[in-house]
Swiss-Prot record:
Belongs to the Fmt family. It comes from the Bacteria. InterPro entries: Fmt (IPR005794), Formyl_trans_C (IPR005793), Formyl_trans_C_sf (IPR037022), Formyl_transf_N (IPR002376), Formyl_transf_N_sf (IPR036477), Formyl_transferase-like_C_sf (IPR011034), GART_AS (IPR001555), Met-tRNA-FMT_C (IPR044135). It is an enzyme of class 2 (transferase). Keywords: Protein biosynthesis, Transferase. This is Methionyl-tRNA formyltransferase. NCBIfam families: fmt. The lineage of its organism: Bacteria, Bacillati, Bacillota, Bacilli, Lactobacillales. HAMAP family: Formyl_trans.
Amino acid sequence: MTRLIFMGTPQFSATVLQGLLENPAYDILAVVTQPDRAVGRKKDITMTPVKKLALAHQLPVFQPEKLSGSQELADIMALGADGIVTAAFGQFLPTVLLDSVTFAVNVHASLLPKYRGGAPIHYAIINGDKEAGVTIMEMVKEMDAGDMISSASLPILDTDNVGTMFDKLAILGRDLLLKTLPDYLSGDLKPVPQDHSQATFSPNLSAEEERLDWSKPAREVFNHIRGMNPWPVAHTLLDGQRFKIYEAELAEGSGSAGQIIAKTKKALVVAAGEGALSLTLVQPAGKPKMPIVDFLNGIGRSLEVGDVLGE
């Protein structure tokens, strides 16, 4: 039985951890995850999905604010694990920790060397990629730069957003890890170096990148909305206030960028730089998210054709 330390934070990571827990070949000695954080409007202190799963299985949990130089690091190394598996952990691993185990592998949600960094799924959708994937790679000090052990891909559909792709890629990553690890640990599967000259990066999105640019073609705006849903959520301005857009559909029509070019009781169509979008799920400032029908029957009733979003 291979003794593991697992490191991860969001639901993507929890799906991978669940697969390891269900496999008798692996003994999870402890789990390392990010500290509990304040979440939502009420700022409720919330455990990470990985912590919830670990506690349900009575596993020791470490939550260092920063792993390097911490007492938690010393405690983790004292466990004497054979290896480390990480998946969307959110911190760099100190070299001393990597050197203390026989192997350390990461489940990364991109087809490396493309989209190294913390937001690969967001960028894949925003950039209009036709596919996304996962890579099982060896951990090194440089971010997501280790040798690749295996990879797998699946298509990105127009109906997909960050949430749906996270769920799909978590399952793909879990299954690929469980398929890959035995051959990797036996030496039958040899890692392949990345072509570092082809590396691209997907840093965490800035607040400025959440704002929609209506001057872009409708397809690009459509991809941007999907690439921000369900977090951090794309927005524009309506009467000077933030107006979040969760979902939209490509539509016919033309007009000035951000201009409302059609309005009915059930639809609101906005022009982009080329083409248009019909908004379907929105969130006005200070309100919950709602279908466009509810918005148009309420505070959106005063909107008129010719009004402009983004101003």
